[in-house]
């Protein structure tokens, strides 16, 4: 990516409430965008046509998690204390899609959930500081809790003497979980807390089961013995029982650099890199060690950015660029591998909005026009999935219909798009 500022190319408007999530997916043999809002509505968009394909109210309150878990299956998780799985195999329909599964879930905090390989990690049902793990059986969608109310703080406390963490002294908890990130290839779970603490765990979801040998003795009714008296006939049977163990959890990372600011964004990249953001101007790039629980063994790049109030961070690893969305509506693009402590923005984006012109009377009695550009709070960021450019060069003269199709294909197949959701319900696309 060069240093030219990405350009706003289109916006999608059908939500009446603040955007809570955005995700681009490949669905129904086309690139689609799924967006959700703070009143529980979901819209699936045709990106090329820039029009809704399906729209329904999935929850009564804010949708916190929105993820496609199979080709035609959507998982949603809302502040109405519910997690649902939907069948979205039908492209066009007026009604809500069939609801395949419903699970009551703790949503006292605004934490997301993580789904992977038929496992689900959620805030614990009895304590928002802890987490539960469920095993999902397909296709019936039967949920079995395999780890209940696990406390990262208790695990941390047991390992406290091994961790060089002076800023964490005196705490008796980490507060509620704000962000969950699961790294599937390494079975790692990273948690960001209300206190600003970050914890990394390794989770063995399938520990070796234990075989228990058992011998059962069955006594028959007593019969006369040839030596006099009574004897018993004993029938011995042996059996082996397989006892499954609950997931094994180990502490692999701990950092308190954000304390006392709550974690608002957490992103994991390849090569053991974790990027975290909080409510201030601080972004931290964690180069952690796989088998060390001491943050002093990690290389921490503590960066200052231009604006406070970090709402969302997404990363483009091909260009070493992170896009930081702030509450004030500004999106910064910065090089996360820069050696500078204060990151220079490669660019700053701010959504194009109509100018508001106000008229007032000055001291001489004349009218004065004031032009102001309104700011709208940014609520969500997402990068488009990678795609091939399908434009075909031809010398044949194109009809108007062909030109319209070509323009749609160009928008839909450009290298990368950055999507931003806003408080007024708009989703805006920027070409990178």
Swiss-Prot record:
GO annotations of cellular component type: nucleus
Main location: nucleus
Record PROSITE patterns: WD_REPEATS_2, WD_REPEATS_REGION
Disulfide bridge map: none
BP terms from Gene Ontology: chromatin organization
Keywords associated with the record: Chromatin regulator, Nucleus, Repeat, WD repeat
Keyword Repeat (UniProt): yes
Keyword Kinase tagged: no
Origin: domain of life: Eukaryota
Location in the cell: Nucleus
Swiss-Prot/TrEMBL WD repeat ranges: 14-55, 58-96, 100-144, 258-296, 395-432
InterPro entries: WD40/YVTN_repeat-like_dom_sf (IPR015943), WD40_repeat_dom_sf (IPR036322), WD40_rpt (IPR001680)
Family: Belongs to the WD repeat ASA1 family.
Reported function: Component of the ASTRA complex involved in chromatin remodeling.
Oligomeric form and interacting partners: Component of the ASTRA chromatin remodeling machinery complex.
The protein's name in its UniProt record: ASTRA-associated protein 1
UniProt organism field: Scheffersomyces stipitis (strain ATCC 58785 / CBS 6054 / NBRC 10063 / NRRL Y-11545) (Yeast)
Lineage: Eukaryota, Fungi, Dikarya, Ascomycota, Saccharomycotina
